[in-house]
A protein has these predicted regions:
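Bacterial signal peptide processing site
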Residues: 25-27
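C-terminal motif of bacterial Sec signal peptides marking the signal peptidase cleavage site
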Residues: 21-23
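Long, C-terminal catalytic modules of enzymes
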Residues: 387-389, 393-398, 403-502
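HKD-type phospholipase D/PLD-like phosphodiesterase module
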Residues: 31-80, 90-309, 349-406, 413-428, ...
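Alpha-helical interaction/regulatory segments in DNA maintenance proteins
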Residues: 515-519, 552, 556, 566-585
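Small-residue hinge/turn detector
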Residues: 543-544, 572
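Primarily N-terminal secretory
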Residues: 483-524, 530
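Bacterial N-terminal signal peptides that target proteins for export
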Residues: 2-12
Length: 585
């Protein structure tokens, strides 16, 4: 153990052996930190809660534990001499934007791809537009406004906007950028990548969006330390070539290309897993999505499953969400071979009816006395599945697995059907014990104080359902329409309830492909489980925001009754009355 961060603290002795003291005694306390782990020469790992490191945040000026992920990205960009290609779902950090603008002015070719939901500068929204937003979106906008409002006076000056609104910084520097509408559509399922390629040889691959919430912490929550995320810095021209190929497919001819040549989502050609050597390390990479016409075994989730199945000693998983039934079914024989399996899942998803955490714990949860037909509770179950204790408002946003403390599964790809079959994603498989040790330390940090096993509230819910649902029916699994698969947008799903309220159902927000509809379709019945966003918006009382929430809800659980619809945020008795004769499932 190394000694770090000597801090002065005041200890007030109010009484000792019956003697009252009126003053405080100042005492120096030495804080022990674990020693930094060795890094591989070509593959470095960073986590924003790393206990061996500390840094002072650039925006809130809080000194805290963790690796500064933003600085790692800035350093990589600042080293560029010829090119920087970046694909990231959401980009709000001005430090990264300023580094890109500086390199652009120095003659480096910069290209940026965003998810279209986040491609508009936050400072450009009017007060009226902000007031019309859902509360979650307003909170997100307020977070970004506080980054921009450098002097904290509640007003955004032109100077603050020009220097602190990340997308304005890039636009003023003439950095070319596109989003997933560049293919001529209204947007793909979700452009969920989070990678940077510098000079065709250095890569940043991370689970974090470039936001304060994912990297540092929220302004509104002083105790927030950012959603738990990891970042890989990799030096490999061979691997960079594969990432550049993925980038170029999406970029096409860039801004204003006619006809549109960009390819997103399932428009991209299928490419199987590729393998390269990074020094002495075997690295596999696969880019999502994979069409359902291709076998699951050849998909990104299939690659994850193959890697998990190779375990002989242990599997540790830290996941934002885990809802692919085939993956958990592949894990069960591994468990039966006496392989130790541990899993941590974000509290907002761990105990939902579709969560594979329930299967591993040997239980099922019904919705209206209906169970998913494919559920398969483990026998014997395991008690090493649970949720981490995070600072209020922070999420477990990792998407990693560790096999035998030798192999790491990482990237942007959530372990869901939505990520597998609809989104632009990255999965990396890295066979390197030095790299794995960093992920193992992060897992153990999260697991040390985690709530594992079946919580009492969930146990009571299972017991109550056993009494209320003596005869249960199964919900047959339905294939997701290709144009409506989506994945979770992290900043929109932060559970407001404490861990003691684990039976709640926090709402998540996702996005779907919009397609045009004609006015002649306005009066026909709409299938809520397959309609596009544009079709949903033809229904009375449903605007863009509610249409997106309906799509979010059906990706997690298909609608089977009006009661299911009633659970969607923004739907009430009056709207149900308007909809009941207009919708089917």
């Amino acid at each position: 153990m190394n000694l770090h961060s000597i801090q002065n603290i005041s200890i007030c002795w109010l009484s000792f052996l019956g003697i009252s003291l009126s003053a405080c005694q100042s005492e120096e306390v030495q804080i022990l930190r674990p020693s930094p782990l060795p890094q591989d020469q070509q593959i470095q790992v960073y986590t924003n809660h790393e206990p061996a490191s500390s840094y002072t945040e650039p925006y809130r000026q809080i000194t805290r534990d963790g690796d500064n992920l933003e600085q790692a990205i800035i350093d990589a960009i600042s080293s560029a001499r010829s090119t920087v290609d970046m694909a990231v779902q959401e980009f709000r950090l001005p430090g990264i934007a300023q580094a890109m603008a500086e390199r652009q002015k120095a003659g480096v070719r910069i290209r940026l791809i965003l998810e279209n939901t986040y491609s508009r500068p936050l400072s450009s929204f009017t007060a009226e537009e902000l007031n019309r937003m859902e509360k979650r979106d307003r909170d997100r906008a307020e977070e970004t406004r506080r980054i921009i409002d450098q002097n904290g006076d509640g007003q955004l000056s032109l100077d603050e906007i020009n220097n602190r609104d990340a997308l304005i910084v890039l636009d003023r520097a003439n950095v070319p950028r596109i989003d997933d509408t560049a293919d001529g559509s209204s947007g793909s399922n979700l452009m969920h990548h989070k990678f940077v390629v510098v000079d065709g040889q250095t890569m940043i691959v991370t689970s974090a969006n470039f936001t304060t919430s994912d990297v540092h912490g929220d302004f509104k929550s002083p105790n927030s330390r950012g959603n738990a995320n990891n970042l890989l810095k990799i030096q490999s021209p061979a691997l960079a070539t594969l990432f550049t190929e993925e980038f170029n497919l999406m970029w096409g001819d860039g801004p204003g290309g006619k006809p549109p040549s960009s390819l997103f989502g399932l428009k991209k050609p299928f490419r199987p897993v590729r393998q390269v050597m990074v020094g002495n390390t075997k690295v596999k990479v696969q880019f999502s999505p994979t069409s359902r016409s291709v076998s699951w075994q050849q998909s990104s989730n299939g690659l994850i499953g193959q890697t998990l199945s190779s375990a002989s000693k242990s599997v540790s998983m830290a996941l934002f969400v885990f809802s692919d039934q085939q993956l958990v079914d592949l894990l069960e024989p591994t468990h039966q071979r006496q392989v130790e399996i541990k899993a941590l899942i974000d509290p907002g998803f761990a105990y939902r009816s579709y969560s594979e955490a329930l299967d591993m714990m040997g239980i099922t949860l019904a919705e209206d006395c209906k169970y998913e037909a494919s559920n398969h509770p483990w026998k014997p179950a395991i008690a090493t599945v649970g949720v981490p204790r995070m600072p209020p408002g922070d999420l477990l946003h990792h998407k990693f697995g560790i096999v035998d403390q030798q192999t790491v599964i990482a990237g942007s790809h959530n372990w869901t059907n939505a990520a597998n079959n609809g989104n632009d994603e990255t999965v990396l498989i890295i066979h390197n014990p030095v790299v794995a040790a960093h992920y193992q330390r992060e897992f153990e940090r999260l697991y040390t104080n985690a709530i594992v096993g079946i919580p009492p509230a969930i146990k009571k819910k299972v017991e109550a359902q056993a009494k209320e649902c003596p005869v249960t029916t199964a919900i047959a699994p339905r294939p997701l329409p290709q144009k409506t698969v989506s994945a979770v947008t992290p900043q929109r799903v932060k559970p407001a309830q404490p861990l003691s309220s684990l039976t709640g159902k926090p709402q998540s927000t996702q996005k779907t492909q919009q397609t045009s509809v004609t006015s002649k379709q306005a009066n026909r019945r709409i299938n809520l489980n397959s309609a596009s966003q544009a079709e949903l918006e033809t229904l009375p009382g449903i605007g863009p925001g509610l249409a997106k929430r309906i799509i979010v809800a059906r990706q997690q659980k298909q609608f089977a009754s009006l009661a299911d619809v009633d659970r969607v945020s923004g739907v009430g008795p009056k709207l149900l009355e308007k909809l009941k004769d207009r919708i089917v499932w």
